[in-house]
From Swiss-Prot:
Name of the molecule in the record: Multifunctional CCA protein
Domain-level remarks: Comprises two domains: an N-terminal domain containing the nucleotidyltransferase activity and a C-terminal HD domain associated with both phosphodiesterase and phosphatase activities.
Alphabetical list of Gene3D superfamilies matching this protein: Beta Polymerase, domain 2, cca-adding enzyme, domain 2
Gene name of the record: cca
Single GO MF annotation: tRNA binding
């Protein structure tokens, strides 16, 4: 039996890109051979085994044949006669169809090294079209390797367009779409993922709420980039640049969905777009089964981001109620995530990317002020329901004093 390192580890090794996961393919072995050597079986659909010591995955070389729609619509065949070339041809991109043996020798039957050198993402064979998830994977690779200058081969982009138009993407489960998208959102250039999906026509099928933003105008005095879709991707760039969490990145992505629902006669103004956005954000989250915590922040940012931009002019009571809705006393980290998302929105505008956003520091200081006021600060004779009422009163008074101090400093 022969063992080869395959896939992403070889690709990233040749690129000089860091990698962690290692996947191996085993040629000329049977499940019985693997079990006899102490490997643990883990594959449900096809024979995959864990190494007894390293726990790394070893899969028997296999071929596959399309038998139905979607990601799981395949029949697999594994046998000692299946060659390395047979196994590699079923992979998505040439740069992922390179293998390395235990002596470090490279096997590259489909030109992956040449495409690595020329910075091209190219499909291995027409079998690429049999798995709709590959459209999302290529978009994610386009985002990951954007800093290296990689481009999608024209024939691959055309095939992705054909797949998007065919309706095959409808067979993808919400879990698979979210898993691939959440991974893409954590890339340093996540905006390229969504731009690629738009370029191949997949965005309107998978994320119609986001696709609808493109071509919708905004007031140029506030948004020099004008287009709502471009603003969304520029805001996402800011979140990636700051290395913010998945929750923040997703909230930034969907914060302006309501602008796609602005009546035509009101354009380019978007009055009440925050309220209009609640329904499409909720629909998108429920359709993709987005985790609850991620959904909650997205809805908060959608509903409240204008209040953050206007925070220094808010009345103390209004600011307290905003902080309360963000669960400031129990979850200060959520307030921080909210501030981060709002700052990305403010900086996701053409020519304003480096403009200061003092609202962020104001919000953080306000959060610390209300959190610093405890029951122990109240008069001893306060009892029962009065405790909660007086705590609120103290916090609002403290916010009023903070606002006055801030205004005095800004006018001095």
């Amino acid at each position: 039996m022969q063992v080869y390192l395959v896939g992403g580890a070889v690709r990233d090794y040749l690129l000089g890109h860091p990698y962690q996961e290692k996947d191996y393919v085993v040629v000329g072995a049977t499940p019985e051979h693997m079990l006899a050597q102490g490997f643990q079986p883990v594959g449900k659909d096809f024979p995959v085994f864990l190494h007894p010591e390293t726990k790394e995955e070893y899969a028997l070389a296999r071929t596959e044949r399309k038998s139905g729609q979607g990601y799981h619509g395949f029949q697999f065949f594994t046998d000692t006669t299946v060659s390395l070339e047979d196994d590699l041809i079923r992979r998505d991109l040439t740069i992922n169809a390179i293998a390395m043996d235990q002596d470090g020798k490279i096997y590259d039957p489909y030109g992956g090294q040449n495409d690595l050198e020329n910075k091209i993402l190219r499909h291995v064979s027409e079998a690429f079209a049999e798995d709709p998830l590959r459209v999302l994977r290529v978009a994610r690779f386009a985002a990951r390797y954007f800093p290296y200058g990689f481009q999608i081969a024209p024939e691959t982009l055309q095939l992705m367009q054909t797949m998007a138009d065919s309706g095959e993407l409808d067979a993808l489960t919400p879990e698979r779409v979210w898993k691939e998208t959440s991974r893409a959102l954590m890339e340093n250039h996540a905006d390229i993922y969504f731009q690629t999906l738009r370029n191949c026509g997949a965005l309107k099928h998978l994320f119609p709420e986001i696709d609808a933003l493109f071509g919708v105008p905004q007031r140029p005095e506030y948004h020099p980039e004008v287009d709502c879709g471009i603003h969304t991707l520029m805001s996402l760039q800011q979140a990636c640049k700051s290395n913010y969490s998945l929750d923040v990145r997703f909230a930034v992505l969907v914060h302006d969905l309501g602008k796609a629902l602005t009546p035509a006669e009101e354009l380019p103004r978007h009055i009440m777009h925050e309220e209009r956005g609640i329904k499409p954000v909720t629909q998108l989250c429920e359709r993709l089964r987005v985790p609850t915590q991620t959904k909650q922040l997205a809805l908060s940012v959608c509903k409240e981001h204008l209040k953050c931009h206007q925070i220094m002019s808010l009345k103390p009571g209004t600011l307290w109620r905003l902080l309360q809705r963000l669960d400031v006393l129990r979850r200060p980290e959520r307030v921080e995530a909210f501030v981060q998302a709002c700052e990305c929105d403010a900086k996701g505008r053409l020519g304003l990317e480096d403009r200061p956003y003092p609202q962020a520091q104001y919000m953080r200081e306000a959060m610390q002020i209300v959190r610093s006021i405890k029951v122990q600060d109240l008069p001893e004779n306060i009892k029962g329901a009065e405790i909660g009422e007086m705590l609120i009163q103290y916090r609002i008074e403290a916010l009023a004093e903070f606002k006055n101090q801030h205004q005095s400093l800004s006018h001095s």
